[in-house]
Amino acid sequence: KSLSTYTKYRIGCAYVGEFLQTHYHVKDIALKELSLPFITDYETFLRTDKHLKINSAMVFVRNLRAMVFRAIDNEWLVKDPFRRYEYKEEETTREFLSKEEIHLLMETPITRKKMSMVRDLFLFCCFTGLAFIDLYNLKEENIKEFFDEGEWIVIHRQKTGTEANIKLLDYPKQIMEKYRGLCEDGRVFPVPNYQSCMDSLKRLGKKCGITKPLSWHCTSHSKFFYLLNISELSIL
């Protein structure tokens, strides 16, 4: 599984533990006690106590379902408590960052060291389209020099397994050089854990005056937006 998936499962386990203590006043329950009311109460807990939007809540409900299915496959559980559960989702429009917002990220003075690093990592992904897990796994051996004498990222994307060849523009190369040599395991960047980066990213957005919620999903959309406006990309 990817690092982000692992992180979501860890957070989900913590949510279930908190739900059990606050609503049932126990630390755990037997698998056979899982029921439809338990699941709907857990969904309500996610949406009220944890203030999650419906689609985010469904991520953690589905993670719980995956664990239940594993229990059924291993014959630890006979009945499926999710059998009559109805999933709820809202249609969302994927956000991309505009040229002006990219400029705000690049030019807003940041004095806090960690926030500055997260900004660099985020902008590197904006210019390359790398997902967070691919940024985390990026190694020196993935940086190649091709026939055009330019540097390229050659990497297999973890989510899809497909190879990606990404030309490095000047700005992401500058970011890469800034952190090169800091990792002893051959990775290009000393990437903090996903949740820590997301926390810093939220504060970064507020600091820069960007109203859109920043996430690593924005980076790939921003990259394709700029590829479609290559003349504008050249003047960033």
Tell where the protein language model's regions lie, with residue ranges:
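Basic, Lys/Arg- and aromatic-enriched nucleic-acid-binding interface segment
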Residues: 54, 58-62, 77, 81-132, ...
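C-terminal catalytic core of tyrosine-transesterase DNA break-rejoin enzymes
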Residues: 123, 127, 133-134, 203, ...
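Short, charged phosphate-coordinating catalytic segments
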Residues: 69-80, 125-149, 235
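N-terminal DNA-binding recognition helix of tyrosine site-specific recombinases/integrases
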Residues: 4, 12-22, 48-82, 133
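C-terminal catalytic core of Y-nucleophile DNA break-rejoin enzymes
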Residues: 157-177, 182-203, 209, 215
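Conserved tyrosine-mediated DNA breakage-rejoining catalytic core shared by Y-recombinases
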Residues: 86, 92-95, 101, 137-177
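Short basic/aromatic active-site micro-motif
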Residues: 34, 59, 117-118, 191-195, ...
